[in-house]
Regions:
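Rossmann-like NAD(P)H-binding beta-loop-alpha module
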Residues: 135-154, 165
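Short, conserved SAM-binding/catalytic segment
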Residues: 51-58, 114-119
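N-terminal Rossmann-like dinucleotide-binding module
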Residues: 1-56
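C-terminal glycine/acidic-rich active-site capping loop/insertion
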Residues: 205, 217, 231, 241-242, ...
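Rossmann-like dinucleotide-binding domain that binds NAD(P)(H)
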Residues: 151-238, 242, 363
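C-terminal helix-rich "cap/oligomerization" subdomain common to oxidoreductases
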Residues: 1-8, 75-77, 124, 300-364
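Beta-strand-loop-alpha-helix segment that lines the small-molecule cofactor/substrate pocket
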Residues: 70, 75, 81-82, 86-132
Length: 364
């Protein structure tokens, strides 16, 4: 069984932004209060601030200066639109604050290069790219990197959009900043609408799903991206992951590999959750097994967190360590490369022509 997580100090962080994604950080702090606390949240709207204070029991401020004057957090989460993020990040850096920003950190390559210059000057800017830390993906990527599949040559990712999908693809392939030739296309198809951010559908309705499929040819490795804009909330469009190596492959939760040239073996990735049937431990994820081997342990058990929240909570833990002088684990350069390749993918889809990436400043 997974070992209990060691006692850790409470991580106190601030938030700039009051949108939908900000609520993920607030839910984490509410679910695991011994590990996380929000020192305050910045929103320009006094009405929004009052509503958040009532719902979440937090303090809100109109400016970052007011937030920082009230209490010095370990770091500040920036959760604002990508067009506004670079200015907000730069302002916090000027105030000597470490920043964990949502994805993407900027809208354009120029934005990314501007932020890269701040990092080179000593700014502590990390990016909350949570998908590789989500329990199932973390387990799958650990298997891919662990050697039993041999050298990885191909990955097909139908998991998440744009830069998120690119990050999972790059991680599965072991790709750093190598250049790629990108081809892409779009396809529209009808689908029955599922739930959305506002809840379940109230009637059956046919809507249009916009699907982007792309190939990233890195020479000796191939990444395939496939995602529909209706996929996140759809009950009838499941996520998929294929990772192929010379000695085996991962197909979603199924793993096959060779122990030697004449001995194949297979195992499934299985979730271990409490609170099912007659189990009275509460409802949380303990971890994931590959056969009988633990390959992922939930460090926030028994907190009642969704997989995405477990991943974001891990981003907070790693950011706290970096803000205190530890290594960078979610660097701006990696997120910049993800977004850069995603922008090129959309260019290839729009023009119908192959696009070749070139090395950017953050890669050096």
């Amino acid at each position: 069984m997974p070992h209990p997580a060691p006692t850790a100090p409470q991580i106190r962080f601030g938030i700039v932004g009051s949108g939908w994604r900000s609520a993920f950080f607030l839910r984490i702090a509410r679910a695991v209060p011994e590990r996380f606390a929000v020192t305050g949240l910045v929103t320009r709207s006094a009405d929004t601030g009052r509503a958040l204070e009532e719902e979440w029991g937090i303090r809100t401020f109109r400016t970052a200066a007011e937030l920082l004057a009230a209490e010095a957090p370990s770091f500040v989460v920036v959760s604002v639109p990508r067009s506004a993020a670079p200015d907000v990040i730069a302002d916090l850096v000027d105030r000597g604050v470490a920043v964990l920003t949502e994805t993407p950190p900027g809208a354009t390559v120029a934005d990314l290069e501007r932020l890269d210059a701040l990092v080179r000057q000593g700014a502590r800017i990390e990016v909350a790219e949570q998908y590789p830390l989500s329990p199932l993906l973390a387990a799958q990527l650990a298997i891919a990197a662990g050697g039993r599949l041999g050298r990885i040559s191909q990955a097909t990712v139908a998991q998440c959009h744009d830069y998120h999908g690119v990050r999972v693809m790059r991680r599965a392939l072991g790709i750093g900043f190598e250049d790629a030739t990108i081809t892409a296309s779009r396809f529209s198809s009808p689908i029955v609408a599922g739930p959305d951010r506002d809840g379940d559908p109230v009637r059956e309705e046919i809507v249009t799903a916009e699907q982007t499929t792309a190939r990233f040819d890195f020479g000796d490795r191939l990444g395939v991206y496939d995602f529909s804009d209706r996929q996140y909330f759809s009950w009838i469009r499941r996520n998929r992951l294929l990772v192929r190596g010379e000695r085996g492959e991962i197909v979603d939760e199924h793993v096959s590999w060779l122990l030697d040239a004449t001995t194949p073996t297979w195992a499934d990735i299985t979730r271990v959750e409490t609170g099912q049937g007659g189990n009275l431990e509460g409802h949380h994820l303990r971890g994931l097994l590959l056969g009988s081997e633990w390959i992922h342990e939930n460090p926030f058990a028994p907190g009642r967190l969704a997989d995405d929240e477990i991943a974001i909570a891990q981003c907070l833990v790693e950011m706290h360590a970096h803000a205190a002088g530890g290594p960078s684990t979610n660097p701006l350069a990696e997120a910049s490369q993800d977004h850069h390749l995603a922008l090129l993918m959309h260019e290839a889809a729009a023009t119908g022509k192959p696009v070749r990436s070139t090395r950017r400043a953050w890669a050096d």
